[in-house]
């Protein structure tokens, strides 16, 4: 694997971890809370953001305005049955979601969830490292590169891995602070 490929793959893993973090409630209204919720629409699972305009009115309220009014009920139902613990209010045209402040217990649950997402991201990085190191060893075995070059490349791969793992840990600590902030 080339250096650029490795960094690109690792960057994608960090971005995926960040997207997972964005779906965790922090007690503040945020449109990305709804990113993981899909709705059955004309026989296909469709993300809410594809069916409606989502905006935050203030720090506690999210507004969802469906492009097609007939999808209002299904969007409301999907939000109700989600694991977000929020209740949508439907006024016939717009769905409003009041995001209540989080309880201490719920904050701790979300911190655990953030840690789980961070660990998944680190595992993905380690898998990328393993694949890259295996390729280096294979190239060395086939005589394509010398033992010294292989070892240098493996050390470089480890440096990338350490860099990106520390980046995930930084993002995790930021997210935990955001969750625990009252």
Swiss-Prot record:
* The keyword tRNA-binding is annotated on this UniProt entry: no
Q: Name one Pfam family in it.
A: RRF
UniProt lists the family membership as follows: Belongs to the RRF family.
| One GO biological process term | translational termination
Q: Which organism is it from?
A: Prochlorococcus marinus subsp. pastoris (strain CCMP1986 / NIES-2087 / MED4)
Q: Which NCBIfam families match?
A: frr
Where in the cell is the protein located?
Cytoplasm
- Its domain of life? Bacteria
Protein name, UniProt field = Ribosome-recycling factor
């Amino acid at each position: 694997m080339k250096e650029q490929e490795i960094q690109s793959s690792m960057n994608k893993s960090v971005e995926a971890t960040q997207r997972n973090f964005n779906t965790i409630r922090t007690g503040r209204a945020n449109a990305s809370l709804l990113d993981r919720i899909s709705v059955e629409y004309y026989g296909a699972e469709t993300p809410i953001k594809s069916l409606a305009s989502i905006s935050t009115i203030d720090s506690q309220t999210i507004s969802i305005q469906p492009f097609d009014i007939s999808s209002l009920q299904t969007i409301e139902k999907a939000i109700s049955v989600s694991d977000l613990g929020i209740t949508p209010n439907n006024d016939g045209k717009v769905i409003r979601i009041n995001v209540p402040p989080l309880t201490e217990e719920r904050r701790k649950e979300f911190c655990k969830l953030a840690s789980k997402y961070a660990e998944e991201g680190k595992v993905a990085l380690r898998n990328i490292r393993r694949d890259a190191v295996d390729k280096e060893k294979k190239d060395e075995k086939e005589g394509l590169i010398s033992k010294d070059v292989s070892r240098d490349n493996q050390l470089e791969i480890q440096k990338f891995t350490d860099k990106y793992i520390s980046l995930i840990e930084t993002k995790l600590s930021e997210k935990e602070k955001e969750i625990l902030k009252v």
